[in-house]
Amino acid sequence: MSLTSRSLLATMISLALYGPAMANENNKLSEDVNDELALTSDNADEIELVRGVCIAPQDRSTDPNNDPIKVTADHAEALDKTKVTYTGDVVVQQGNRTIAADQAYLRQPENIVVAEGNVYFHDGTIEVDSERLQSDLDTEDSEMDHAVYNLTCEPGRGEARRITKTHAQGTQFYRMKDGTYTTCPAEDNSWRFSATTLEREGDSPFANLYNARFEVLDVPVFYLPYLRVPVGKERLTGFLYPSVSYGSRDGFEFETPFYWNIAPNYDLTLTPKYMSNRGLQLNTDFRYLTEFGQGSLKGEYLASDKAADNNDSRWAFNYSHNGTYKSNWLFDVDYSKTSDFNYFTDIDSSIGNREDNNLLQTAEVSYREQYWDSTLRVRDFQPLTETGQGSQYRLMPQLEFNYYRPNLPYELDFSMASSISSFANDASNKPDATRVHLEPTLTLPFATPWWSLTSEAKLLYTYYNQDLKSYSRDGIEETVSRTIPTARIHSGLYLERDTSIWGQDYTQSLEPQIQYLYVQDKDQSGIYNPVNDDGGGYDSTRLQQDYYGLFSDKTYSSVDYVAPANQFTVGASTRYFDGNFKERFTLSLGQIFYIDKPTVDDEVESYSATALETEFNYADWLFFKSSMQYDASDKEVQIANGAIEYRENGVYIQPNYRYVSSSYLDKYVTNPNSVNDDGDQDGISQLGLSTGFPLNGGLSVRADYFHDLNVNKMVEGQVGLTYRSACWLIGLTYNKYASSSLGSSNTEYDNNVSLTFSLLGLQGAKPFGASSDTSNAMSYGNSFSLNN
């Protein structure tokens, strides 16, 4: 029989009032019911359609209480006005709610519905199989006995002697007596929580467990009188999973993070970390999100380092913020500081790395309008050197003003970049300076789908007021100004054709381009700069001339030295796109030809090094990327790097290599602080290998290895073994890295072993291969761009 009405209560009452009269009139109720059921679908099929389906509250278009009711059964009987009984494959459906049972009846006037025998209940977020269900139609309170439940919108299942669902002030509460909870799949009891009482309020991400036991393979591991566990995907207050490791530097390590979800837009993570060789450290990470942007405050404090001289306290902190206000104002802050220069060498940190030479301390505020913007910036560094002095200049402050005016008469675009900067350094042998820079630019762009031509003229005016202190050099001046005109003409073509390779159709593009650049040669010896002064320049370093850098209009990152130019740059790129217009191969080649030939190290150069870049993606499982700069004059490769990777079915292997010649470092790396004592004076030649692959039965392994070929020593290596089941994960990692100079005869290494464990479903686990299990700086990285 199929009945439809606006409420289950109305349906039951109508049967209670009129059912007896119907039965007395013709005594054919059972027969009529069976006849009508012949027009409906099989009840078992209806249950299978909803079993395991998630219908989240936000996905429901209407209030289920206002939806019509559909009741199907083999037989319905109303003996009097106090009880109506349904028997045989009873199914009651209302919106997202479904109840199925062998038998169901209504008791009046209490408005109590009772379902018995193979009871199934589904309300969109939870499904329950039980022996008996009792529900109050007035309050929607329910009880289910000897129940097995499954959460349909999030991981979680279990069983209970009784499940009670109650309502109070619009909120529903679930309570389980003698219940269990796990995120493992059915028939898998790798782990579970058991408790005499489990409680959950509505859609709360927590479950409260009383007299709780944690069991592994049905064996109790620990007992707690009260435990609160996360059962949803929301950010949750509570202890996160601990980590255990052992290293030759810090000894035994144990840390237990505690996460505090203060508010929807504030949270705090407190991590006590015990190191047997050093002591107890407290790490904090506070994050916030406001109308002015987002930021974080990180702190690390070790009260008494047993491995340090005099048991000194050691610390580090970082504050970062970026955001906007009313769409015009932009804010950016990044400030870090530490107690001593060896902090990141001695202690693993989320604030800095052991390779860092400086800690950045910067803040800026910007205001933007349609045609102009302005930025006030301050920047400092904490040198991580024994003397506390470094080569970097403080910017205290810098004021930038930029003006843009496109679409002037004759299709011209105009812009004006300007700045006033104050540079300071504590070293007595380095000058300080105030610099004023103006850079008006006129641009005439022209473009079609296949051709472009851009002409540009600039005037670079710079004024310096330099405090030389004890620094001296012939020609350097305290006050100096410089005006340099520049001109640039850049043109490019875009051509394409259909082609076929090995029976596969492709679209090939050919993109040649040519540029003429003129920068007037001016005497700049009066300025402290990277050409006339070894390691000089306030904020200028030489840019790397890769393929795209060849077409830049400047050689240095800033204006302390403006390299003269009278030159042509010629280059071309070709790309191959498959039938889905997915880029599969690219090759770029370019070179600069000098009209006015520059002199470098007393050698006249007629052309620059040839820059080559290529990338290849074959069938989304084999990737290759490489770049090279080849100097034909010296017949040597200046810079080269490359990586090839096989990635398929959870397996990846990536050999990679990077190289910088010693002559390139001698010529162009003029900042002595950028060349460390790890053998870089002999150039850089480093080989790396990263790999990861699954083994049998949920086991997987990953490894990284990096080797310096110049000194024939390992830089860093690690290997990790991970076991992942459907509901838990455990990983063991060994890491070894050089903790002293590779150039020394007796390089020291630190060794670390770490163990991680995670219950999947209670807390998200990072995918295998996404990041390193240790704090090593060198690990697997996906540098390929043709994998879109």
Swiss-Prot record:
InterPro entries recorded for this chain? Answer: LipoPS_assembly_LptD, LptD, LptD_C, OstA-like_N
**GO CC annotations?**
cell outer membrane; transporter complex
Q: Does the keyword Signal apply?
A: yes
Q: Where in the cell is it found?
A: Cell outer membrane
Signal peptide, first to last residue: 1-23
**One GO BP annotation of this record:** lipopolysaccharide transport
Could you list the residue ranges that cross the membrane?
none
Task: Recite the UniProt keywords alphabetically.
Answer: Cell outer membrane, Membrane, Signal
What Pfam families does the annotation carry? LptD, LptD_N
The record describes its quaternary structure and partners as: Component of the lipopolysaccharide transport and assembly complex. Interacts with LptE and LptA.
Concerning NCBIfam families, the annotation shows:
PRK03761.1
Chain's role: Together with LptE, is involved in the assembly of lipopolysaccharide (LPS) at the surface of the outer membrane.
Family classification:
Belongs to the LptD family.
Q: What is this protein called?
A: LPS-assembly protein LptD
Recorded name of the encoding gene: lptD
